[in-house]
A protein has these predicted regions:
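Positively charged n-region of N-terminal signal peptides that target proteins for export
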Residues: 1-4
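C-terminal motif of bacterial Sec signal peptides marking the signal peptidase cleavage site
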Residues: 18-20
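Bacterial signal peptide processing site
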Residues: 22-24
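Extended beta-strand solenoid/passenger and fiber regions
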Residues: 34-186
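Serine-esterase "nucleophile elbow" of acetyl-processing enzymes
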Residues: 180-253, 282-289
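Oxyanion-hole/transition-state-stabilizing segment in secreted/luminal serine hydrolases
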Residues: 211-212, 218-220, 225-226, 247, ...
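A short helix->loop->beta-strand "cap" motif at the edges of active sites that frequently abuts
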Residues: 329-333
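Catalytic His-Asp segment of secreted/periplasmic serine-dependent ester chemistry enzymes
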Residues: 339-425
Length: 425
């Protein structure tokens, strides 16, 4: 077994130590029964020893499986003639495969990658190549829209690409076996809080699902070969139940919580003209569907951070949206999704605008969403932000942000869907 690095047998411990399953908090760590590498290889069907475009592989929380499927990474140059080390969520006890981001290209062990002390190593001459600095950074700094500060604003920075399609050819996925437990933040199951949704699932009835978000909800950031996070969530509900899901995606790229409130109140002059037509179209869809919705996901915050909106105002606006849907259907279950972290390394590059993209702490928004969870019934917080914070202790920010701005990679979109689905079931 040339790719085995370590073999350990952990005892069976199926109950995680919880840090407040209610009150909107995440769990601290999760423990699963860990088998030896040999046991995993012997007991797992062959088709499950490879990374596939599979709804269960994509939406089962990574911390609940010993095989880490399709963990994504961006390979970058280190500025000194080499490449930055690949960061994995766990030490890799056995690497099953490494593929291109689209899963179409399978790379060869020994030639394209090695495994040393649990780490994935890319040797010289590998077909796994890093994004050249000449493509990651832009030569025309004067006319560039964004400046990237590798040290989160501590240096002058360099002009950087914000085109995800420039970066996707240098994104890869690795499927491997871990033999260590996870100690990071995880999402608790809160299906019991979502009384209407859970009853519909139990009765095997059809589900009407609304998703109210921004460009992340529209699917910005993904490469196009796979379902976006909203579509994955719908498919994940269907895979976990005998219910068919009718999805209405009411997301509006570029919108924030205040603009959604203004949209509903008809204050169109207070909405960015560049998004107004799309916003009006999505409002019509919400008006048509709100009275029939069984579950509504409200997922905002990234653009509020860019607007430097206070947590108190953000809470007020989200509360308005909750009331809007509850007035139409008092029984509707509502999921509040905290926003993924956006880049804290990038700022505007205009003479009249040098602002950072990330101005307000998104963690503060997660806290007020937890307060709303306690103030209403039949509601649950899916705390994507806190779950992702533990991921970022292991991974590069560029592994989860597709375009150096605020949009999720395919890999991060799967983490989003995993958190939403874990929360509602």
């Amino acid at each position: 077994m040339k790719k085995i690095l370590s073999v350990c047998l952990a005892g069976c411990a199926l109950c995680a130590a919880l840090a407040g399953c209610d009150g909107g908090e995440t769990q601290s760590g999760t423990q699963i029964e860990l088998k030896t590498v040999e046991e995993v290889l012997e007991q797992t069907p062959a088709e499950d020893l490879v990374g596939r475009n599979d709804i269960w592989q994509f939406t089962t929380p990574f911390y609940e499986t010993q095989i880490q499927y399709n963990e994504g990474f961006l390979l970058r140059e280190d500025g000194q003639g080499g490449t930055l080390p690949v960061r994995l969520m766990f030490p890799a006890a056995y690497v099953l495969e490494v593929r291109s981001n689209d899963l179409k290209t399978l790379y060869e062990y020994g030639k394209d990658y090695l495994v040393e002390d649990g780490q994935l190593v890319i040797p010289e001459g590998s077909a796994i190549v890093p994004v050249p600095d000449s493509e990651f950074f832009l030569s025309d700094a004067e006319n560039a829209e964004w400046i990237y500060n590798a040290n989160a604003g501590e240096d002058e920075g360099r002009a950087v690409t914000t085109d995800r399609f420039v970066l996707y050819p240098y994104r890869y996925v690795v499927t491997y076996i871990r033999t260590e437990q996870y100690s990071g933040k995880t999402a608790p199951s809160k299906g019991g809080q979502l009384t209407h949704f859970s009853q519909k699932i139990a009765d095997k009835e059809g589900i009407t699902m609304l998703y109210v978000g921004d460009s992340i909800g529209e699917g910005a950031g993904v490469s196009g070969e796979f379902l976006n996070l909203v579509e994955m969530t719908r498919s994940g509900i269907e895979a976990r139940s005998e219910s068919k899901v009718e999805l209405s995606n009411c997301s509006v790229g570029g919108i924030d919580s205040l603009e959604f409130m203004n949209l509903i109140n008809g204050l169109y002059d207070k909405i960015n003209p560049g998004i107004l037509d799309n916003a009006k179209q999505k409002l019509r869809l919400m008006e048509q569907k709100k009275g029939f919705a069984d579950i509504v996901f409200i997922a905002l915050g990234a653009n509020d951070s860019a607007a430097d909106r206070s947590a108190d105002l953000f809470k007020l606006h989200i509360g308005f949206l909750i009331d809007y849907f509850r007035e139409a259907n008092p029984d509707v279950s509502i999921v509040l999704a905290s926003s993924m972290e956006i880049s804290n390394k990038i700022r505007k590059n205009r003479e009249d605008d040098k602002r950072d993209l990330r101005l307000h702490d998104l963690g503060e928004y997660a806290k007020v969403l937890a307060e709303l969870e306690q103030e209403y019934t039949n509601i649950a917080l899916a705390d994507v932000h806190t779950v992702q914070s533990s991921v970022l202790e292991k991974k590069y920010l560029e592994d989860v942000i597709a375009d150096n701005l605020n949009h999720p990679t395919n890999y991060m979109s799967r983490l989003y869907a995993q958190t939403l689905l874990k929360t509602i079931f």
